[in-house]
């Protein structure tokens, strides 16, 4: 690892899509391809000043004309020349102001390690309760007029209202979702990609957060 890079317990990448690879026995393994992108330290949050220790990370890239003035100031102070599109924080037990402007190293994730991956689930538009919440639905045979409806949503004269967060039809997807305990199959820093076994949330070209597994060491 070079002096211009640091190691944290999480990184951000781009979901490129899915494919499959074959092991030495000829068994196919479904994998998700994650594009490795620069993760740059743009701010250092300290317990004394901010109440907690964390690094603000900038990733993604866009034209300079699309950057607003506050973000330009943050990047200039950090000495970051890349016009990043997204900012996020990664908490750390200890932080060092000398790491400002450095890049996070992907080498912390090795083949065989277990990770948790967070992304934004695909949007599926307006959906009914059977698709959205896996409701059973009504009878499908003849004579029934009740097939895919949610059924009664009320109660009685008391409380005479529908409770908050009642499961009803509505927008499905576009929610932060995390899959846990999935295995890193390959990390190729030269080619700029890593392979993770199985599927992860989100659509192609969406940003994902890869973290060391909480439940598995």
Sequence positions of predicted segments:
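Extended basic (Lys/Arg/His-rich) segments that typically form rRNA-contacting surfaces
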Residues: 1-217
